[in-house]
Amino acid sequence: MITKADKNAVRKKRHARVRRTITGTAARPRLNVFRSSKHIYVQLIDDAAQTTLVSASSKDKALDLTNGGNVEAAKAVGKLAAERALEKGIDTVVFDRGGYLYHGRVKAVAEAAREAGLKF
């Protein structure tokens, strides 16, 4: 019998493996990306204090998006997260792609955040 691993389970395993080495601090928080089929979510997390410093998602009222599951929405979310981070005085982060491939929406979030002024 041929069995195929669940994609999300494999992603979670990959993310756990990466998270052993990547940690965020108050000075340099972790920019975490979560992607669903309809929306994309970004958080800047201080792992030392276990707090979320900044968050943005395609569900935010500030963005007023009709479709939250495409590359354009991901760019808008990345830009919004970077703007909110810069308002709080955060300019450098550690990028955590959440076990997803660095492609498509995840890449769009990263590039938009870089263009808006975050360094990573």
From Swiss-Prot:
Protein origin, superkingdom: Bacteria
Signal peptide: none
GO cellular component, one term: cytosolic large ribosomal subunit
Record-linked Pfam families: Ribosomal_L18p
SUPFAM superfamilies in the record: Translational machinery components
UniProt-recorded Gene Ontology molecular function terms: 5S rRNA binding; structural constituent of ribosome
UniProt entry keywords in alphabetical sequence: Ribonucleoprotein, Ribosomal protein, RNA-binding, rRNA-binding
Coiled coil region boundaries: none
Biological process terms in GO annotation: translation
Family: Belongs to the universal ribosomal protein uL18 family.
Assembly and interaction partners: Part of the 50S ribosomal subunit; part of the 5S rRNA/L5/L18/L25 subcomplex. Contacts the 5S and 23S rRNAs.
PANTHER family: 39S RIBOSOMAL PROTEIN L18, MITOCHONDRIAL, LARGE RIBOSOMAL SUBUNIT PROTEIN UL18M
Main function: This is one of the proteins that bind and probably mediate the attachment of the 5S RNA into the large ribosomal subunit, where it forms part of the central protuberance.
Protein name listed in UniProt: Large ribosomal subunit protein uL18
Natural source organism: Exiguobacterium sp. (strain ATCC BAA-1283 / AT1b)
Gene: rplR
